[in-house]
């Protein structure tokens, strides 16, 4: 099954290009790189300056899908291991509307 904006929360994230659009906590904003590892609460990004660990529930992420499409996702929806996220019931509206300002979800 291909990764789409509608099913991104249920997919494996390792290998996807990622950019931190907004951060509620530490200064993650602006970090860009490829996701190389994932735990229940964190993502590890390989950036030009090395690997950076970011806390999922503190950020708004922009993920580049294999199709080239970009989607913004509230990191709080990604908390949990990929196999745990499969059983979560998440509505698509939650993916495109989260805790951040609506303008943050637009390009």
From Swiss-Prot:
One of its GO terms (biological process) is tRNA 5'-leader removal. Part of ribonuclease P, a protein complex that generates mature tRNA molecules by cleaving their 5'-ends. It comes from the Archaea. It catalyses: Endonucleolytic cleavage of RNA, removing 5'-extranucleotides from tRNA precursor. SUPFAM superfamilies: Rof/RNase P subunit-like. The keyword tRNA processing applies. One of its GO terms (molecular function) is ribonuclease P activity. It comes from Methanopyrus kandleri (strain AV19 / DSM 6324 / JCM 9639 / NBRC 100938). Its main location: cytoplasm. Keywords: Cytoplasm, Endonuclease, Hydrolase, Nuclease, tRNA processing. Belongs to the eukaryotic/archaeal RNase P protein component 1 family. This is Ribonuclease P protein component 1. One of its GO terms (cellular component) is cytoplasm. The gene is rnp1.
């Amino acid at each position: 099954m291909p990764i789409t904006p509608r099913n991104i929360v249920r997919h494996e994230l390792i290998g996807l290009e990622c950019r931190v659009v907004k951060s509620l906590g530490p200064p993650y904003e602006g970090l860009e790189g490829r996701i190389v590892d994932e735990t229940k609460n964190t993502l590890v990004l390989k950036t030009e300056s090395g690997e950076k660990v970011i806390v999922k529930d503190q950020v708004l992420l922009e993920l580049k899908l294999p199709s080239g499409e970009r989607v913004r996702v509230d990191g709080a929806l990604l908390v949990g291991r990929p196999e745990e996220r499969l059983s979560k019931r998440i509505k698509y509206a939650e993916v495109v509307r989260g805790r951040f300002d609506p303008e943050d979800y637009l390009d």
